[in-house]
Curated annotation (Swiss-Prot):
Gene3D superfamilies: Ribosomal protein L22/L17
Principal subcellular localization: plastid
Compartments it resides in: Plastid, Chloroplast
Pfam families recorded: Ribosomal_L22 (PF00237)
Record bears the keyword rRNA-binding: yes
Superkingdom classification of source: Eukaryota
Protein name: Large ribosomal subunit protein uL22c
Gene behind this protein: rpl22
Length: 115
């Protein structure tokens, strides 16, 4: 039985819809660290930027805190949860106001080392 360590990184209050983030997360779930970075580099979605940062942070945590090699890391779990919504109003005719909800999300990446 092998003893696998896992490391976590979380990015909170990302100003993007969790639905759009999850579309990209589904592409990299279960991939190796280097393969995930390559996929994110060439995807045409803006969600790739914040996800790329979180994956880099998780790899840095693995190297600095646990002494793990970045080349042996795989993405074990990755998910995006809803954050609070920024509430804004849009003025409309005759004194009315329409509500605008700007979504935020929290991205969590859990990586583990393979032997």
């Amino acid at each position: 039985m092998s003893n696998t360590q896992s490391v976590t990184a979380v990015a909170k209050y990302i100003r993007m819809s969790p639905h759009k983030i999850r579309r990209v997360l589904d592409q990299i779930r279960g991939r190796s660290y280097q393969e995930a970075l390559m996929i994110l580099e060439f995807l045409p979605y803006d969600a790739g930027g914040p996800i790329w940062q979180v994956i880099h942070s998780a790899a840095a945590n693995a190297k600095h805190n646990s002494g793990l090699d970045k080349k042996k890391l795989i993405i074990d779990k990755v998910f995006a949860d809803e954050g609070p919504k920024l509430k804004r109003i849009r003025p409309r005719a005759q004194g009315r106001a329409y509500k605008i909800l700007k979504p935020t999300c929290h991205i969590t990446v859990v990586m583990k080392a393979i032997d």
